[in-house]
């Protein structure tokens, strides 16, 4: 907190609430914003069972019924594979479940190329916040680009309160600043095969460096 951190996003890859209890208590005790996470993914073809909107709704109700102190909820699609309809149904149900003023956040990666459509579905369902990135480190295993999202929202009832021309200038400066760093080509890749073996974007980047 003394170094400027205000929020900690707290997640367990298997959605085991027991693994979020003590860490959540410590985050709140330190006076930080505790954003508790429900991990999402789409199952590969031929797999059935977990990771349905009903599963996520059950997880959310378990969180609300627990004694874990938290301030907001993030739905985290680490592999970027959840199809937009599932996103919509999950967020729509969550919005009806949590208090009206509670922040619902969606985090995804653009590894499968559907990040923008996921966010549009989430916005229609009532999401509060989404995570975006800035070129040259947007897209692929990172988050969708902020300018692309701004463009995709044209003609809808929503927009991003940004000046796109200023962002273009900022991205030019950022690209120059990043020119001395190696960016693995795999980290910029969009692959149609990701939904067949969902791997988190961060894990994919780390394992190819």
Name each model-derived stretch:
Residues 1-9, 13-209:
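Catalytic cores and adjacent flexible loops of soluble metabolic enzymes
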């Amino acid at each position: 907190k003394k170094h400027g951190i205000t929020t900690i996003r707290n997640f367990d890859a298997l959605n085991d609430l027991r693994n979020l209890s003590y860490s959540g208590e410590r985050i709140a005790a330190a006076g930080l914003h505790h954003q508790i996470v429900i991990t999402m993914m789409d199952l590969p073809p031929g797999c059935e069972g977990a990771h349905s909107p009903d599963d996520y709704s059950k997880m959310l109700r378990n969180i609300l019924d627990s004694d874990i102190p938290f301030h907001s909820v993030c739905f985290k699609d680490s592999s970027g594979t959840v199809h937009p309809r599932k996103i919509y149904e999950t967020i729509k149900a969550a919005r009806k479940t949590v208090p009206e003023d509670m922040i619902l956040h969606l985090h995804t990666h653009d590894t499968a190329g559907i990040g923008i459509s996921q966010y549009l579905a989430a916005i229609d369902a009532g999401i509060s916040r989404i995570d975006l990135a800035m070129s040259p480190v947007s897209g692929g295993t990172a988050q969708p680009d902020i300018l692309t999202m701004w463009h995709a929202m044209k003609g809808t009832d929503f927009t991003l309160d940004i000046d796109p021309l200023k962002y273009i200038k900022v991205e030019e400066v950022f690209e120059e600043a990043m020119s001395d760093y190696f960016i693995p080509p795999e980290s910029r890749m969009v692959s149609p095969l990701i939904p067949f073996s969902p791997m988190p974007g961060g894990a994919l980047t780390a394992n190819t460096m």
